[in-house]
Amino acid sequence: MPSPKLSSLILAPIAAVAFLASCAPSAPGGERHGAASSALTAQARLTACEQDPRVVAGLVTREICAGADIFFRETFEGNGRSCGTCHPVENNFTIDIPFIDTLIDNNPLDPLFIFEQEPELEELETFELKTLGLIRVNIDGYDDLDNKYVMRGVPHTLSMATTIAPDPANGTEGVPVHRTGWSGDGAPGSGSLREFLTGAITQHFPTDLGREPGVAFRLPTEDELDLTLAYQMSLGRTNELDLTQVSLTDPEANEGRLAFLDPARGRCNVCHSNAGANHLDSGLNRNLDTGTRTAPASGTIGAFDGGFGGKDQAEPNLDVIGLGFKHGFGDGTFNVPPIIEAVDTPPFFHTNAFGPDIEGAVAFYISNQFKQSPAGQELEARFGAPIAFPDSDIVKIGRFLRVLSAAFNVDLARQRLDAALVLVNRFHDSSADVQERLMKLADVELDDALQVLAVGGTPLHPASRDRLRLAKAEIAAGLTATRWSQRQGRLAAAISRVKVARDQFGSNITYRLGKGNLMD
């Protein structure tokens, strides 16, 4: 048993700790975090986090803990939304149609749908949030709300430590200092990820569309900006793979790896080096015009999304979709996302118009739409021929990416299960709620891995999928356990099952994971 002193520390009934500990996640689409514009200051959150068992055990820093609390629960005196409203941890930090449909059924008054509940916010979103998963974004400014907006999918917030350093090759050195959002210019001010929070509050949190700070919302403090940044930079993975050293046990997946790397076949590695978001030449994130802008999913005026750099344009400067006249703002380029995380966050690209599976996104790159785009033409000039690969390579590249994604999912699950076991060993039942939350989030990641590995044709790692199902059964049993020792045994068994499943994928698929993955 933990010492009486330690038990009293963890269970201390102070208001701040109760606030932090009372907000467990549930199944996607169910009752979500109790977001509120609280009286907690950043310092109060830091103090409360000193008593979080994950911090006490050294699994998470108090800064990451406090940043997560802001991310998921602080509404900044706005309309009830938090960052977690559109970036739920239970759904890979994004929203999609299945998630939205379930949320409509389970909680139709969720703040995501505030535009249907408050007349003054009717134009905050459009009906396409529910039908296409697209949100309304005034990326080019708020001077013409009726006409100057775009419709975009919600990008996940995973692994941003690897994706936001801008490539000077775009000719935009200086501002923005980070590549954020779908067009790489999503943050106000200097364009930093730190300042992205200010832009998100202004865009998505207001109580009215006048968006006056201090009236429609409050701005974050300097400490809140710092803490939220610390949390976001600790999500997902913090390293890149070396695909030349990776070897996959599934023959078709490994052949897909070779096609991905081969400039005579996929050429994927040029713009998505090591299946990440950075360019091969620089190791930095580059904006590209790949032609996805010419096929929007949306039929509203917001479909005319010109991408990067539209904010300073007084009049439309770009023919976005080939109408013969200028109707969009920007230079046509968009931010390159990491592929490892993209596999289980469909649909794809900023328009949500491609998918539903990763193979659909791969197939886009042999379409005329891509070949005729500036990015496609650049690759043709570089290698002396248009990009071309057979349909069989679409399947193989898809299998390769699915294995990388499943390995990432399994590693996230393992990280959370390991943390839960540390807590049960140290604190026994005194932190059971946190242990169980970690177990539930691990279970969600195992579901993702199983879904990613479930492909048509030749089965992809059937033995691993069996082990993952057994691990899920151990987690389920652990969640119903009445004593810590029972939960301890189930966790150990689940970890063993997960390890065996993961080992069968291949070698050198090594992810370093951020500590923020343990928060919710």
Give each language-model segment a name.
Residues 2-13:
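Bacterial N-terminal signal peptides that target proteins for export
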Residues 23-25:
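N-terminal Sec signal peptide cleavage junction
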